[in-house]
């Protein structure tokens, strides 16, 4: 199969009488309701459920092994290879399946807010609510947006099409397959809308570094003086919450590029976790869930259609998708200068990492490569309670290239622009998961504010004797004892045991990196 066939197949789908291209939000909402794909909530949002798959399915994600890219990809459990022949067979089946649908929905937009680096995308959906999701999450073209001569990356999404592992070369009925040569993503067997978003992110994580742009799984905001802050962390660690600040303008909540000019959002919307969401704790997100927004797997009252964000009947991984314009204080376009502060967020299930610490450059590289956090319930299938994990660059599931490519780029950027780096634990305090409690959000906000506003630049610090981290002794609005983990534990022997255990876990994990990273480990790793 060559690119001409692909182009003809796509054109045949787009030209079908039942294909709806670039429908407005109200028309998509009408289609969703008429097709019984979702219901309206009391605030006017659409609520849809996703069946068995309420999170990503990482074991079903593949990259096509192609001559132009196979020597660049970091093959393994994250980036599983699949043959060109298997892709071609599935592609033909998916196109045939989509042609037989009563209706198809197409969105044409972009990934990348900086026009110099943006990538055109075409999303073909079996579901109208998936198309609304794509319209709200990716960048919507406006009249002034110049057309791109670049060939679009196309998503063909067929949730009700199920693969046959024996004949199709997949691991299950579900598949998410990326072909870089054919600039096509096939998604089938799962109704979880997040697969579309993360597939495009994976593509950008392959393409942007080729242009000397660091692609990052982070949120970003900017202060009144133009000072930019980045927040790295996996799902549920607080990226979206902590970057939605009343005093700072949001650049984006999840995916960014860092070019020679500064930072830009890859997306045009937000995909916020909304388990236990409240107007009091997260007013910006709460308010954003209005007409045109999509609620995923959120429980509604049968009569009033009011959302119950505390009810996890479907999953703990409940989500809200909405365009970034729903947030009051945003930067438009979603572009800003170079970061002055970088925050690594982790949810430490053992409760032994300090709630905030200042990192040297070597420590920043070490913790970026380590990407320690806890998998939180429901962000992937099969995970029902927190468990310790290391996710390289705080985004390992989405990184096609070897880790050192991204780490070296980050180190270079820190050197060039003098960004200060902090490690913030939004996980547990006073004990590990099950005995301790989750960090107080107000305390975390106060610590982050002090870090990004430069209040910790000359603060008095002590050095943790296990992890070598530099811990501030005082931060306004935070009790002093909270800042030092050992002081929050009743059982000091248990604290020492857990802290040493975690330090050893860091060391064991770091063995997977080449000896070239030994200097980073010596200067940036635990002291024990």
Swiss-Prot record:
Subcellular location: Cytoplasm
PANTHER family: PHOSPHOENOLPYRUVATE CARBOXYKINASE (ATP), PHOSPHOENOLPYRUVATE CARBOXYKINASE ATP
EC number(s) given by UniProt: 4.1.1.49
UniProt keywords, alphabetically: ATP-binding, Cytoplasm, Decarboxylase, Gluconeogenesis, Lyase, Manganese, Metal-binding, Nucleotide-binding
Task performed by this protein: Involved in the gluconeogenesis. Catalyzes the conversion of oxaloacetate (OAA) to phosphoenolpyruvate (PEP) through direct phosphoryl transfer between the nucleoside triphosphate and OAA.
Record-listed Mn(2+) binding positions: 198, 217, 254
SUPFAM superfamilies registered for this protein in UniProt: PEP carboxykinase N-terminal domain (SSF68923), PEP carboxykinase-like (SSF53795)
Family: Belongs to the phosphoenolpyruvate carboxykinase (ATP) family.
Reaction catalyzed: oxaloacetate + ATP = phosphoenolpyruvate + ADP + CO2
Stated name of the protein: Phosphoenolpyruvate carboxykinase (ATP)
Pfam families: PEPCK_ATP (PF01293)
Record GO terms (molecular function): ATP binding; metal ion binding; phosphoenolpyruvate carboxykinase (ATP) activity
Cofactor detail note: Binds 1 Mn(2+) ion per subunit.
Record lineage: Bacteria, Bacillati, Bacillota, Bacilli, Bacillales
Gene Ontology cellular component terms for the protein in this record: cytosol
Amino acids binding substrate: 56, 192, 198, 319
GO BP annotation list: gluconeogenesis
Annotated ATP binding sites: 198, 217, 233-241, 282, 319, 444
Gene that this sequence comes from: pckA
Cofactor(s) annotated in UniProt: Mn(2+)
Pathway terms, separated by semicolons: Carbohydrate biosynthesis; gluconeogenesis
Coiled-coil annotated residue ranges, if any: none
């Amino acid at each position: 199969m060559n690119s001409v066939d692909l182009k003809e197949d796509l054109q045949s789908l787009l030209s079908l009488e039942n294909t709806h291209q670039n429908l407005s939000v109200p028309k998509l909402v009408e289609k969703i309701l008429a097709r019984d794909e979702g219901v309206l909530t009391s605030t006017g949002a659409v609520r849809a459920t996703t069946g068995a798959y309420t999170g990503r399915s990482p074991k079903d994600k593949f990259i096509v092994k192609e001559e132009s890219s196979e020597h660049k990809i970091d093959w393994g459990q994250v980036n599983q290879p699949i043959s060109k022949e298997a892709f071609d067979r599935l592609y033909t089946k998916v196109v045939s399946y989509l042609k037989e649908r009563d209706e198809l929905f197409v969105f044409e937009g972009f990934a990348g807010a900086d026009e110099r680096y943006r990538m055109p995308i075409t999303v073909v959906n079996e579901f109208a609510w998936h198309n609304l999701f794509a319209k709200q999450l990716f960048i919507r073209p406006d009249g002034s947006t110049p057309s791109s001569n670049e060939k679009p990356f196309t998503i063909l999404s067929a949730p009700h099409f199920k693969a046959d592992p024996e004949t199709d070369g997949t691991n299950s009925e579900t598949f998410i397959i990326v072909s870089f040569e054919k600039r096509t993503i096939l998604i089938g067997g799962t109704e979880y809308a997040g697969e579309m978003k993360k597939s495009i992110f994976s593509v950008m994580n392959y393409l942007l570094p080729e242009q000397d742009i660091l692609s990052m799984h982070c949120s970003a905001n900017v202060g009144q003086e133009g000072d930019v802050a980045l927040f790295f962390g996996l799902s549920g660690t607080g990226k979206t919450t902590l970057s939605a600040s009343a005093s700072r303008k949001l650049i984006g909540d999840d995916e960014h590029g860092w070019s020679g000019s500064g930072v830009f959002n890859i997306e045009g919307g937000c995909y916020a976790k909304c388990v236990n969401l409240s107007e009091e704790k997260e007013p910006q997100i709460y308010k954003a869930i209005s007409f045109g927004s999509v609620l995923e797997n959120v429980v509604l009252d049968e009569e009033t259609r009011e959302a119950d964000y505390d009810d996890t009947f479907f999953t703990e991984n409940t989500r809200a998708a909405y365009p970034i314009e729903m947030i009051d204080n945003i930067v438009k376009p979603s572009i800003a200068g170079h970061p002055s502060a970088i925050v690594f967020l982790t949810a430490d299930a053992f409760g032994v990492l300090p709630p905030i610490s200042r990192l040297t450059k070597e420590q920043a590289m070490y913790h970026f490569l380590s990407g320690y956090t806890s998998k939180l319930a429901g962000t992937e299938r099969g995970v029902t309670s927190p468990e310790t994990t290391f996710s390289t660059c705080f985004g390992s599931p989405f990184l096609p290239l070897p880790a050192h490519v991204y780490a070296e780029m980050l180190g270079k950027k820190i050197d060039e622009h003098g960004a200060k780096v902090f490690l913030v634990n939004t996980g547990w305090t006073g004990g590990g998961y099950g005995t301790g409690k989750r960090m107080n959000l107000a305390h975390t906000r106060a610590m982050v504010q002090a870090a990004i506003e430069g209040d910790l630049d000359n603060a008095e610090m002590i050095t943790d004797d296990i992890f070598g981290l530099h811990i501030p002794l005082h931060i306004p609005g935070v009790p002093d004892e909270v800042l030092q983990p050992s002081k929050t534990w009743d059982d000091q022997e248990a604290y020492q045991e857990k802290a040493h255990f975690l330090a050893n876990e860091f060391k064991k994990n770091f063995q997977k990196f080449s000896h070239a990273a030994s200097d980073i480990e010596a200067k940036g790793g635990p002291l024990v």
